[in-house]
UniProtKB/Swiss-Prot annotation:
Bilayer-spanning residue ranges: none
Major place of residence: cytoplasm
Protein name in the entry: Ribosome maturation factor RimP
Cross-referenced SUPFAM superfamilies: YhbC-like, C-terminal domain, YhbC-like, N-terminal domain
UniProt-listed InterPro entries: Ribosome_maturation_RimP, RimP_C, RimP_C_sf, RimP_N, RimP_N_sf
Organism (species): Shewanella baltica (strain OS155 / ATCC BAA-1091)
Localisation: Cytoplasm
Cytoplasm among keywords: yes
Length: 151
């Protein structure tokens, strides 16, 4: 997680948890004047639109006071969804046996894009079975990771 995203997660964790939700993760996508801050929340019984609206008001109030982003951006608060992004070792460990899609910073086995089943998480290392081959990826090498939804 980038430094700004880490700082934002630390800043927003308590206010989101005060509403009874879990702060699942943060994505900040810079695109000039059209930057987007995505805040993913989850709850024991899932998340509905009213939950997102309440969390958005709380998050917006904190961001207005703390002002961690100096440029213009759009705030989006949502559920992680069925193809949820994964951010932490604990989140990856919770989905051992499930299929994921990873975008890497540095290639592993000649590729920056991997699809496979999580076989283990050991500290900051993720083991993945890709096309019958076991690969190990450092979590800090993962630019983006998502579950692959099964229908």
């Amino acid at each position: 997680m980038a430094t700004l995203e880490f700082r934002l997660a630390e800043m927003l964790k308590v206010p989101v948890e005060a509403l009874g939700f879990q702060l699942w993760g943060i994505e900040y996508v810079q695109a000039g004047k059209h930057s987007t801050l995505r805040v993913f929340i989850d709850g024991e019984n899932g998340i509905n639109i009213e939950d997102c609206a309440n969390a958005s008001r709380q998050v917006s109030a904190v961001l207005d006071v703390e002002d961690p982003i100096s440029t213009e951006y759009t705030l989006e608060v949502s559920s992680p969804g069925v193809d949820r992004p994964l951010f932490t070792a604990e989140q990856y460990a919770g989905y051992v046996g499930e299929d994921v899609k990873l975008q890497l910073t540095m290639p592993v086995d000649g590729s920056r894009n991997l699809k496979g089943a999580i076989t283990a998480v050991d500290g900051q290392m993720l083991s993945l079975k890709v096309n019958g081959k076991e690969l190990v990826v450092a979590l800090d090498n993962i630019r983006k990771g998502n579950l692959i939804a099964k229908f």
